[in-house]
Amino acid sequence: MKRKEIFWLIGTAIFVLILNFSLFGVNGFKAESVTDINIHDTYFVIANFHFILLLSVLIFFSVYLLRMLRRNFKNLTVNLIFMICGILSIWVLTGIISIVSSYIGVTETTEYNLPVTNTMFDNVSKLLYLILIIIVILIAYSGFKTGLNYRKAE
């Protein structure tokens, strides 16, 4: 790994830490710190670690997406970091989709109710699935271009 890549990786990590400290404070990094989300009569208690992980993955993904596109897939290290961040973002988005889908199932309250379509959470779920598909396509394309560039270099 080149020195420039190490500096970019450390700089991005420091930026993520500063942003997380400014948003969540020192208490946000403690194991017992949680965030309560109240939606109608349902409470979701989510550890702050999940929000910190989400923000960190999104920042790393966006920084290395821009670096990868700017360098035209020529830098192997940037491409690998991008693919790792893409896989982590798929993991995080899958968890968010499961939370949204569980809330879609809670909306049914009667025994013989009609199915509700086009609710806000239904649209959010579809948008998250679309983002997930776009990330998978970007990772596949990045792997393809990395393989082509790596083969040309040998």
Model-derived features: positions:
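Membrane-interface interhelical loops and short amphipathic "cap" helices
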Residues: 26-48, 103-121
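Alpha-helical transmembrane segments of multi-pass membrane proteins
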Residues: 15-30, 126
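Cytosolic juxtamembrane helix at the C-terminal end of the final transmembrane segment
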Residues: 68, 136-154
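Hydrophobic alpha-helical transmembrane segments
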Residues: 47-59, 116-138
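Alpha-helical transmembrane segments and immediately adjacent membrane-interfacial amphipathic helices
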Residues: 57-62, 91-102, 129-142
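Hydrophobic alpha-helical membrane-insertion segments
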Residues: 8-22, 80-99
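Canonical alpha-helical transmembrane segments
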Residues: 54-72
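N-terminal membrane topogenic signal
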Residues: 1-12, 146-148
